[in-house]
Regions:
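Alpha/beta-hydrolase superfamily serine-hydrolase fold, recognizing
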Residues: 2-149, 153-397
Length: 397
């Protein structure tokens, strides 16, 4: 199998110790623009009908598989998963091409990406998922997979090709997109993570079919893209100092432990948590649940060469999903800013290296001087590269 790959730098770059840009987010009005919930005990929300924005392919557009003379041909679908530390953000992020912030107006490069995909013959769906204070992990993962099943089950209504669905997202959305790509319908066989869980328990943990309205449909996607996504929540704490940045998130919001149930390493006993040592736990969440989440919430574990798996597909895709040297792993494009002080770029480099070792089609684009969520990660050149990569990897031929 041919492996795609580009590094927009000489090898894997390193950066000098850099002043931590904790003010970057505050100056941009990041915290003013989002109302962050006050965390106490969780306020669970049962998954019902998720919210989505749907953008059909532009009339007369063409892709690598269809031409402008075939307007009725089903379109490939890009499912976009918003970011926001798993605790805020919205499916409306792709609507307006002008972004209005407390500091003024600027182009919404994510919406411009959506428009470029439409013009290239893709349909685009931007979805919501439950926040971490509404559903502990893997609730958000279940919601994204349910969205894939929903669109696949309603292929005729939306005019999409169910064999050509890709998923992509930024930051927290990139983390979820990578997990969707590399755990989809895999658990009916052996465990992706090599744990001792039974196949049914493992399957339900990653798929959430018990609460699904479309349990007979596959959650597998043909390809994926991650923009500055987290691939290993355990090492992000050490990656930041290695990259020359402070240990914690700006305005430390505890995004990781609030998502998974506790800090890492997981405290031995919820009743003896030592806050002075930085230990935290979400009220009402048992330590055993947090331990399981910390064992399974990392995309890197699903793609490492030593975790070679025979991923079983529910749908017999005629695309890049075929079994082969990759062990069935899903093609993935990664985009990351080298100056990202929130999620260091090493988080994407490791996934890229693991996929290359397994001969899985993959591309890594490292953006010089770009911060977390930087609009330069969605430049027209990168969007075109993303289109080319996804067109190749979701091809139905």
């Amino acid at each position: 199998m041919n492996t795609e790959g580009t590094l927009h730098a000489e090898g894997v770059p390193t950066i000098e110790s850099t002043e931590y840009r904790s003010g970057f987010y505050r100056e941009a009005g990041f915290y003013d623009a989002h109302s962050l919930p006050d965390y106490g005990a969780q306020s669970p929300v049962t998954r019902e009908a998720f919210a989505y924005d749907f953008f059909p392919a532009a009339a007369g557009a063409s892709t690598a598989e269809t031409s402008a003379t075939e307007p009725s041909s089903p379109a490939p679908l890009l499912v976009w998963v918003h970011g926001g530390a798993w605790r805020f953000g919205t499916n409306q992020a792709l609507r307006d091409t002008i972004l209005r912030t407390p500091t003024g107006e600027q182009p919404n490069t994510q919406a411009l990406m959506r428009a470029a995909f439409q013009q290239a013959g893709w349909a685009v769906a931007s979805i919501n998922y439950r926040y971490s204070h509404q559903a502990l992990f893997p609730g958000a993962l279940h919601d994204v997979k349910e969205a894939v099943r929903f669109f696949r089950a309603n292929e005729h209504e939306f005019g999409i090709d169910p064999q050509r669905i890709a998923v992509a997202g930024g930051s927290a959305g990139g983390h979820l997109s990578m997990l969707v790509a590399h755990t989809g319908d895999s658990a009916a066989g052996e465990s992706v993570f090599g744990d001792s869980a039974s196949a049914p328990e493992h399957d339900e943990y990653f798929e959430g079919r018990a609460a699904s309205s479309y349990p007979s449909h596959s959650s597998q996607v043909a390809a994926a893209a991650s923009f500055y996504g987290v691939s290993d929540l355990r090492t992000i704490f050490t990656d930041r100092p290695l990259a020359g940045y402070a240990l914690d998130h700006p305005e430390d919001d505890g995004a990781e432990w609030r998502l998974l149930g506790s800090t890492y390493p997981v405290p031995a006993d919820a009743s003896t948590i030592d806050i002075s040592k930085g230990e935290r736990a979400v009220p009402g969440v048992c330590i055993e649940r947090a331990q399981k989440n910390w064992e399974r919430a990392h995309p890197i574990d699903a793609v490492r060469p030593q975790k070679r798996v025979n991923l079983k597909r529910v749908n017999k895709f005629k695309s890049a999903l075929a079994q082969g040297a990759s062990g069935g792993a899903t093609p993935l494009m990664l985009v990351h800013g080298i100056s990202d002080s929130c999620v260091p770029y090493q988080q994407s480099v490791r996934v890229y290296q693991a996929l290359r070792t397994r001969q899985v089609p993959t591309v890594l684009v490292l953006v010089p001087d770009a911060e977390h969520g930087d609009s330069r990660c969605f430049s027209p050149e990168i969007v075109q590269q993303m289109l080319q990569f996804l067109n190749r990897t979701v091809s139905s031929e």
